[in-house]
């Protein structure tokens, strides 16, 4: 009986520890984005939307790379924004499609050429993260 209790406690502990990890892709609101930009934060921003085939293809690969390099990114889901917020984001970043990954430095995008647009493979993502200075290893 004691053995079963110990095993059960160990299993529960493992489940709790593995389930409490920080998510590599954190969905934020428009207000959260505004605060981060106004505070001149540096972060990775993914712009996505529900029903986007490219987003569905890209996100598992993107999350895998973020986890591999112990990085986090903020995600804005255009589908969950008001029409006004959506327009502001599209105008601010001149979004042509989703997913779009933007590298923000001190509240601004230093270069449009650093973006990741559309569903891209792991090597491409790693290269862009390297160019943006988030990882040292780039292929």
Predicted regions and their residues:
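C-terminal motif of bacterial Sec signal peptides marking the signal peptidase cleavage site
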Residues: 16-19
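Structural micro-motif
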Residues: 90-104
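Thiol-based oxidoreductase modules, predominantly thioredoxin-like and allied folds used
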Residues: 47, 70-86
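Local sequence-structure signature of Cys/Sec-based thiol-disulfide redox active-site neighborhoods
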Residues: 34-71
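Positively charged n-region of N-terminal signal peptides that target proteins for export
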Residues: 1-6
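Bacterial signal peptide processing site
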Residues: 21-23
């Amino acid at each position: 009986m004691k053995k079963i209790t110990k095993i059960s406690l160990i299993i529960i502990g493992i489940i709790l520890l593995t389930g409490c990890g920080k998510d590599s892709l954190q969905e934020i609101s428009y207000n959260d984005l505004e605060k981060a930009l106004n505070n001149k934060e540096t972060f990775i921003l993914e712009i996505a939307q529900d029903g986007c085939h490219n987003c569905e293809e890209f996100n598992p690969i993107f999350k895998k790379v973020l986890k591999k390099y112990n990085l986090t990114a903020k995600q804005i889901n255009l589908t969950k924004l008001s029409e006004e917020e959506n327009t502001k984001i599209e105008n601010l970043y001149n979004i042509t499609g989703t997913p779009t990954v933007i590298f923000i430095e001190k509240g601004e995008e230093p270069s449009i050429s650093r973006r990741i647009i559309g569903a891209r493979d792991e090597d491409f993502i790693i290269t862009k993260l390297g160019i943006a200075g988030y990882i040292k290893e780039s292929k």
